[in-house]
Amino acid sequence: WKGKRLLLTIDGAAHEGEVYWNGKKIGEHHCGYTAFTMDISDDAVYGIRNTLVVKVDSRESVNIPPFGFVIDYMTYGGLYREVWLDIKEKTYLKDVFVRGDLSGDSGRLISEITADGGGENLSVRQKIKRCGESGYRLLGECELTGTKLVLDYTVESVLPWDTVHPVCYEVCTQL
């Protein structure tokens, strides 16, 4: 894992949370309903056992609903969803949002891509295939010059999805 990005994700900590790595406070989160991620790459000590502590306060807070005794039960508290470590390369695709637009038998595929970590001579390649079929069709490849990129491709011979003949497509985005 040395030389890689280590991203610690806590999917649910109700309600106030403080995160400690090897005794050092590395962050906090004030919402029991949303996941949060912290980059621990610089805090991890390689070759020894590292310690993660999550301190959670589940008492009612005026800043996190429900409050004001508007519900007739005690809300849950503590870590109620997964905690996991995601290991990434130094530069990686952080977000890929794909949306499609169908017009007749051709479609338009628009992807908003966010990369993290930077670097030189990087490119993003995108390809598509129908689910259940082998082999992708290359849509294109584009140089990544910053952290954000929008790709816009036309895809021919698209079959629409419907309840009688469901057709699913798989899009692969590579850095």
Show which residues each predicted segment covers:
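Accessory beta-strand-rich segments of carbohydrate-active enzymes
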Residues: 1-95, 118
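Beta-strand-rich binding/interaction modules
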Residues: 106-143, 149-151
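Extracellular recognition modules
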Residues: 53-55, 170-174
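Short strand-edge motifs at loop-to-beta-strand transitions and within beta-strands
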Residues: 34-38, 147-153
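Short glycine/proline/serine/threonine-rich loop/turn segments at secondary-structure transition edges
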Residues: 4, 44-49, 155-170
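Short beta-strand segments of immunoglobulin-like
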Residues: 96-103
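Short coil/turn motif common to extracellular beta-sandwich-like domains
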Residues: 2-7, 104-112
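Conserved aromatic beta-strand anchor motif in extracellular beta-sandwich/beta-rich domains
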Residues: 19-23, 126-132, 175
